[in-house]
């Protein structure tokens, strides 16, 4: 994992087990405010990467006169719309922190498999340099959200189990119009889902720590 990423729970457990009982009891944990700050930064970065890639793909492969039509087609339907996740800031404000974390985790995990195929689709480094970087960043964010859930789980009642939406793999046949539209739709959903995660995390962070310069 890259420097500056989330503390590994396994590493902390191993180190803690090797400490005397008194030292283990006082082993410093990352403050909740830092966990939220790190999660927001990672979500912002991923959302920006997704938005830039979507625009570049659109500019490269989708004729301008087809863009509006394609955005309103079935190819643009996102599986994440089948779960009761908030669609904006106002809706998110009505949900508890644990509910928002569960939605965020489901959205992140739904993309872990598809993004591993990006390098086979965009061999000219169109997407984020390499798909490995995207996968690693998603895993980082997944671990950060799970860390937040562990911190909050004793203080919030458990909600109903959410079914994880499943996205198809990106299609490698870019000369096929159907494949282009499929990938265009997937990138659109990736961008939308990461925007949702970013919004949820910002709502939680602002609600808990009330920064005067808080923007969502």
Curated annotation (Swiss-Prot):
GO terms for cellular component: extracellular space; nucleus; plasma membrane; secretory granule; trans-Golgi network. One of its GO terms (biological process) is negative regulation of gene expression. Residues 1-25 form the signal peptide. It is found in: Secreted. Disulfide bonds join 78-189, 206-214. GO terms for molecular function: growth factor activity; growth hormone receptor binding; hormone activity; metal ion binding; receptor ligand activity. PROSITE patterns: SOMATOTROPIN_1, SOMATOTROPIN_2. The keyword Cell inner membrane does not apply. Keywords: Disulfide bond, Hormone, Metal-binding, Secreted, Signal, Zinc. PANTHER family: SOMATOTROPIN (PTHR11417:SF2), SOMATOTROPIN,PROLACTIN (PTHR11417). Belongs to the somatotropin/prolactin family. This is Somatotropin. It comes from Gallus gallus. The gene is GH.
């Amino acid at each position: 994992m890259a420097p500056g990423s989330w503390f590994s729970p396994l590493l902390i457990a191993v180190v803690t087990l090797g400490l005397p009982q008194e030292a283990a009891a006082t082993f410093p944990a990352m403050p909740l405010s830092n966990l939220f700050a790190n999660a927001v930064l990672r979500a912002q970065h991923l959302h920006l990467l997704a938005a830039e890639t979507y625009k570049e793909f659109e500019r490269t492969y989708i004729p301008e006169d087809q863009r509006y039509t394609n955005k309103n087609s079935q190819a643009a339907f996102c599986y994440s719309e089948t779960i009761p996740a908030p669609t904006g800031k106002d809706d998110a404000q009505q949900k508890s922190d644990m509910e928002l974390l569960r939605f965020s985790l489901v959205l992140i995990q739904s993309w872990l498999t598809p993004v591993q195929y990006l390098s086979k689709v965009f061999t000219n480094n169109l997407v984020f340099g390499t798909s490995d970087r995207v996968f690693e960043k998603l895993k980082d964010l997944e671990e950060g959200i799970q860390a937040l859930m562990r911190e909050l789980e004793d203080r919030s009642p458990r909600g109903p189990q959410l079914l994880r939406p499943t996205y198809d793999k990106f299609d490698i046949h870019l000369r096929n119009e159907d494949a282009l539209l499929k990938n265009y739709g997937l990138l659109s959903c990736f961008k939308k889902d990461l925007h949702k995660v970013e919004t949820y995390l910002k709502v939680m962070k602002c609600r808990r720590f009330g920064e005067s310069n808080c923007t969502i």
